[in-house]
Amino acid sequence: MDWKIELIFVPVTDVDRAKEFYVRIGFNADYDQSPSEGMRFVQMTPPGSACSIAFGTGLGITLAPGLQNTIQVVVPDADAAHAQLLAAGVKA
């Protein structure tokens, strides 16, 4: 049986700012809805990835922002990825 990771929750303090950041570095904004009062769910996916990240408000996530620091991103060209991040204004 194949097991695949499809969604990783990332705690953030500012949902709009986080969404803008991920869009700026090239992620697709797949979903941004408030299914109920006090809840907002945002799903972002890097181009070519089968795994997305999710964040929002009212989701019951208990991790403090900044503690999710072990996500591994695989790219075919690290130098090109680094250049893309720098061009998007990310400090490396």
Regions found by a protein language model. Give the residues of each.
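Structural motif
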Residues: 24-25, 88
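Conserved short beta-strand elements that form part of the metal-binding/catalytic scaffold
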Residues: 28-66
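Vicinal oxygen chelate
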Residues: 1, 7, 12-16, 32-33, 40-43, 47-49, 65-92, ...
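A generic short-segment signal for beta-strand/edge and adjacent turn/coil regions
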Residues: 10-14, 23-24, 37-44, 61-62, ...
